C-alpha cells in the first residue's frame, strides 16, 4: 500500500496508474512551459538554451516512457482513446515526430527551426496529449478498477 500526503490509499498498479494520470496535468504543463522557455532562450542565448534542452528532452523521454508503459500494461489501443479531434495514437505519433525533429535540428545546427519547434509545435502537441489523458484514465478506471470494485 502506498499513501500520499492526503492519505489516499493505493493498493494496486491500476490505482497507482490512475493516480499518476490524475497528477500528470501539472507535469505536462511544466513540459509545455519549459519547452516554450527553451525556445525563447534559444533565440536569445543559444548556449544557455542548450543547457536547459538536455533536462527538457530527458523529461520528455520520461513522459514518453510513462505513456508507453501504461498503454502496454493495460493493452490500450491508442486509436480507441479519442475525441472529436483525433486519437491518442495520432497525438503520440506527432509527439515522437517532434522528438525526432529536435534531434535533427540539433545535428544540423538549425537553431532557428529548433527554437520555433520548441515554441509552437511541441507545446501544441503536448496540449493535445494532455487533453486525451483523462480519456486514458477513464479507460483504465472503467476496465480495470471499477470491475474489481463491483466484485468486492
Task: For the regions a language model picked out, list residue spans one by one.
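C-terminal-biased regions
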Residues: 1-152
Amino acid at each position: 500500500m502506498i499513501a500520499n500526503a492526503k492519505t489516499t490509499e493505493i493498493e494496486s498498479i491500476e490505482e497507482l496508474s490512475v493516480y499518476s494520470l490524475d497528477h500528470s496535468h501539472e507535469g505536462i504543463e511544466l513540459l509545455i512551459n519549459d519547452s516554450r522557455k527553451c525556445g525563447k532562450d534559444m533565440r536569445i542565448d543559444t548556449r544557455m538554451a542548450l543547457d536547459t534542452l538536455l533536462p527538457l528532452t530527458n523529461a520528455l523521454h520520461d513522459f514518453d516512457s510513462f505513456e508507453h508503459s501504461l498503454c502496454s500494461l493495460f493493452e490500450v489501443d491508442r486509436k480507441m482513446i479519442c475525441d472529436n479531434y483525433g486519437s491518442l495514437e495520432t497525438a503520440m505519433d506527432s509527439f515522437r515526430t517532434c522528438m525526432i525533429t529536435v534531434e535533427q535540428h540539433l545535428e544540423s545546427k538549425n537553431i532557428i527551426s529548433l527554437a520555433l519547434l520548441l515554441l509552437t509545435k511541441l507545446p501544441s502537441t503536448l496540449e493535445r496529449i494532455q487533453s486525451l489523458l483523462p480519456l486514458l484514465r477513464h479507460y483504465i478506471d472503467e476496465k480495470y478498477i471499477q470491475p474489481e470494485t463491483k466484485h468486492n
